[in-house]
């Protein structure tokens, strides 16, 4: 009986994502389908996207700082824009530099722009 109590306690401590993963594993193992009532499926479906890690980021140039020329050069190198377009983008901050970038790419762009003197954020 102690083993069953431990299993119940362990299941009670699972997060929503862990419980969903357990459900999928049991469905595969036993070859069954866990059909949930509509109300429960709606609640679980609404909560799941909030727990997912964001995979795409928009890199936003907030301010060019004191070294505007260096920031313009870096923006040109990162975006392939011409001098006038890059200058307009930098002077019009806050503006997006890159939209839909992966986490690694966004971090790389942010570090390059900050090294040039800009203030950058993700959205």
Curated annotation (Swiss-Prot):
User: Which interval of the chain is the signal sequence?
Assistant: none
Q: Give the CC-aspect GO terms.
A: cytosolic large ribosomal subunit
In its UniProt record, a GO molecular function of this protein is: structural constituent of ribosome
Q: Does the keyword Ribonucleoprotein apply?
A: yes
Q: Which UniProt keywords apply?
A: Ribonucleoprotein, Ribosomal protein
Q: Which InterPro entries match?
A: Ribosomal_bL12, Ribosomal_bL12_C, Ribosomal_bL12_C/ClpS-like, Ribosomal_bL12_oligo, Ribosomal_bL12_oligo_N_sf
Question: Does this entry carry the keyword Phosphoprotein?
Answer: no
Question: By its UniProt entry, which Pfam families does this protein fall under?
Answer: Ribosomal_L12 (PF00542), Ribosomal_L12_N (PF16320)
Its BP terms in the Gene Ontology are: translation
Q: Which residues form a coiled coil?
A: none
What is the superkingdom listed in this entry's lineage? Answer: Bacteria
**Protein family (similarity comment):** Belongs to the bacterial ribosomal protein bL12 family.
Per the entry, what this protein does is: Forms part of the ribosomal stalk which helps the ribosome interact with GTP-bound translation factors. Is thus essential for accurate translation.
Assembly and interaction partners: Homodimer. Part of the ribosomal stalk of the 50S ribosomal subunit. Forms a multimeric L10(L12)X complex, where L10 forms an elongated spine to which 2 to 4 L12 dimers bind in a sequential fashion. Binds GTP-bound translation factors.
Name of the protein in question: Large ribosomal subunit protein bL12
Q: Name the source organism.
A: Bartonella quintana (strain Toulouse)
């Amino acid at each position: 009986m102690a083993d069953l109590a431990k299993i119940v306690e362990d299941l009670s401590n699972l997060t929503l994502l862990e419980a969903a993963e357990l459900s999928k594993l049991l469905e595969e193992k036993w070859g069954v389908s866990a059909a949930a009532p509509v109300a429960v499926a709606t609640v679980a479906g609404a909560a799941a996207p909030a727990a997912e890690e964001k995979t795409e980021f928009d890199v936003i140039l907030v301010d060019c700082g004191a070294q505007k020329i260096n920031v313009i050069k870096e923006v040109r190198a990162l975006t392939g824009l011409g001098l006038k377009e890059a200058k307009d983008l930098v002077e019009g901050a806050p503006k997006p530099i890159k939209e839909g970038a992966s986490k690694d790419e966004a971090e790389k762009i942010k570090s390059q722009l900050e090294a040039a003197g800009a203030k950058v954020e993700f959205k």
